[in-house]
Amino acid sequence: MGGLTASDVHPTLGVQLFSAGIAACLADVITFPLDTAKVRLQVQGECPTSSVIRYKGVLGTITAVVKTEGRMKLYSGLPAGLQRQISSASLRIGLYDTVQEFLTAGKETAPSLGSKILAGLTTGGVAVFIGQPTEVVKVRLQAQSHLHGIKPRYTGTYNAYRIIATTEGLTGLWKGTTPNLMRSVIINCTELVTYDLMKEAFVKNNILADDVPCHLVSALIAGFCATAMSSPVDVVKTRFINSPPGQYKSVPNCAMKVFTNEGPTAFFKGLVPSFLRLGSWNVIMFVCFEQLKRELSKSRQTMDCAT
């Protein structure tokens, strides 16, 4: 097709932030049941004496939740999840190119691997501090079960914000920031840098054009790498965030208890749904992100030319 291509039009910061937020929200809506299954598998084993149903695998978990708690339970915490994407994903993804440009300002060469990694670390860290309260609420709503007469801790998203702030203080909304920071910078670096490098390699070597198939394959590879790298930290983060006050003394204490009580394999609980979720999330998000950036930039340039 003729006309402008992605390389012809450089998206503005506003276009990148908006495109990242919308693409991340769309990906979250589609993959949220997989995320809920991942959370349920990760917190399973915290209370060995509990009579709550045991989950087995991704499909087994999803089936069990639907059968015992209803389909909508798979989307418990979705409003907080969307708030998280708008507040954090838009920043960690939308600011990535801008931070790279800042780090390489005045240099005629392309961004180095070091600058890509530093950009991923920076945007991932900023996003965590801003979006942590939404992560806490999302995880707790996903983890709570209504089985066997267990009274849920929270009745909804805003009820969860209020109760956590009231009973645990405002710091309760930032509980688990340390493991989430570790997880997010690992995922952000691995995800964005791998995607960037794979896309560049495919295009530079004329394997794939800078279009949907290239974005799809690059995103899938990035999702696999990010999942494998972040799984242990992700399990600790989920356990620590979901725990009531006093269950764990600290993040290292949480990690030690997981290791002592359940063994090293517990750090990879929910690995399959994590990959299914992050892999599919990456594909949807990156493909939509690239297309939105391209179309919005072309529309903006067309409007500028018309005026």
Curated annotation (Swiss-Prot):
It is found in: Mitochondrion inner membrane. Solcar repeats lie at residues 11-102, 111-201, 210-295. One of its GO terms (biological process) is response to cold. Brown adipose tissue. Residues 1-10, 97-116, 196-212, 290-307 are mitochondrial intermembrane. PROSITE patterns: SOLCAR (PS50920). GO terms for molecular function: cardiolipin binding; GDP binding; GTP binding; long-chain fatty acid binding; oxidative phosphorylation uncoupler activity; proton transmembrane transporter activity; purine ribonucleotide binding; transmembrane transporter activity. Changing K269S: Severely reduced H(+) transmembrane transport activity. Residues 33-73, 134-178, 233-266 are mitochondrial matrix. Changing R54S: Does not affect H(+) transmembrane transport activity. The keyword Membrane applies. It catalyses: H(+)(in) = H(+)(out). Has no constitutive proton transporter activity and has to be activated by long-chain fatty acids/LCFAs. Inhibited by purine nucleotides. Both purine nucleotides and LCFAs bind the cytosolic side of the transporter and directly compete to activate or inhibit it. Activated by noradrenaline and reactive oxygen species. Despite lacking canonical translational encoding for selenocysteine, a small pool of the protein has been observed to selectively incorporate selenocysteine at 'Cys-254'. GO terms for cellular component: mitochondrial inner membrane; mitochondrion. It holds the Pfam family Mito_carr. The modification Cysteine sulfenic acid (-SOH) is found at C254. Fatty acid 16:0 binds at K56, K269. It is a multi-pass membrane protein. Keywords: Diabetes mellitus, Ion channel, Ion transport, Membrane, Mitochondrion, Mitochondrion inner membrane, Obesity, Oxidation, Repeat, Transmembrane, Transmembrane helix, Transport. It comes from the Eukaryota. Most probably functions as a monomer. Binds one purine nucleotide per monomer. However, has also been suggested to function as a homodimer or a homotetramer. Tightly associates with cardiolipin in the mitochondrion inner membrane; may stabilize and regulate its activity. Belongs to the mitochondrial carrier (TC 2.A.29) family. This is Mitochondrial brown fat uncoupling protein 1. It comes from Homo sapiens. The gene is UCP1.
